[in-house]
Amino acid sequence: RLFILGEIIHNPEVNEQIGALGIRNLLGREKQAEVNELTAEDVVIVPAFGTDVTTLAEIKARGCQIVDTTCGDVMSVWKRVRQNATEDVTSIIHGKASHEETRATASRAVLEGRGHYLVVLTLADTDYVCDYIRKGGDRAEFLAHFAGAMSDDFDPDLHLRRVGVANQTTMMRGETEEVQR
């Protein structure tokens, strides 16, 4: 049996063609099966966006053959956020918090219990973070503003002291460059 982790690309026609080939989806809106249903005889395709470390570990534990098509640019971003974690640098990830790639990147920013991340989508989000770094602010308001877009134990008063920028590779390059400034 063949499975895929979410969409191979954000194109409904292509994803319908994949489904017509009998490849079943394990994640996302079009989910057709559960990871706990997998056996060692199954093949699982990891799309170019990659997947989070927990899902990957669950699939490996089931003994499946994995076809990893994660984009090299995505893996470069993962390397950066892992390095940030080892240096106690918080990764500011420019992207959509719910996007598969951003979730995969965020999961690598907190590996081995080290590291933190915060996802910013807009330049207004970035300005909000920069203002908090420069002037401080209401911690509860900050946490509410970025709910669902930060590591579990994120504390802006502690985790914004040293930051590094990473990005969801599908974001506009110019926007990410603005976030970095």
Regions found by a protein language model. Give the residues of each.
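The feature marks the mature, well-folded catalytic cores of soluble enzymes
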Residues: 1-181
